[in-house]
Amino acid sequence: MRTISRTIKVELLNFSELSPEEQELVETAARVRMCAQSPYYHWWVGAAIRCELGEVYDGCNTENVNGSETVHAEEGAFIMAVKEERKQGRHAKIQAMAIAGGPEGTEIEIVREAKTSPTIKINELCFACGHCLQVIWENSMVDPNVVLLLLTTWGEVARTTIGDAYPMPFGPENLGVDIRQSLK
């Protein structure tokens, strides 16, 4: 028997420790989160994507009584990115994404300077659901270094990569497809 293991790296940061580009994504995700429509789960989520050339696109979750018709915030942002990037003749390759989620109607105060965070476990940080991690993976052009930022409900920012958040993905490469070539 052989054992294969992997370490998952997540950094907990104050807003001031982020780059200006990361700060913009986190602020955008937090702002658009307040537009969510979540009458059933009462959990509002906002997402912001930065594509390869620096454009930022956002989205929020919109629920319907038929759960399969619900649009996740990450999907909404990506749909906007695809539409706008395709107008320019480009594919929407995700460079970084920020996600902010929390109870309906509550604003999350962004911690801008040093503050002691609560003791947390790694599985308490939900960067995205499995469905959205798959969407992010495929639209990162299978680049494991795409940055994911999570505005926690206590105001700190957690930073990881899609490779760490989704360590065993199934994607185009498993089917022998070079996603960059097939989208030209």
What are these regions (language model features)?
Residues 40-42:
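Short solvent-exposed loop/turn micro-motifs enriched in small/polar/acidic residues
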Residues 44, 57, 128:
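Short glycine/serine/threonine-biased micro-segments
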Residues 44-51:
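Short beta-strand scaffold segments in enzyme catalytic cores
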Residues 55-101:
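Helix-adjacent hinge/juxtasegments
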Residues 51-55, 152-154:
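Short acidic-glycine loop/turn motifs at beta-strand connectors
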Residues 50, 63, 134:
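Short, electropositive, low-hydrophobicity segments enriched in small/polar residues
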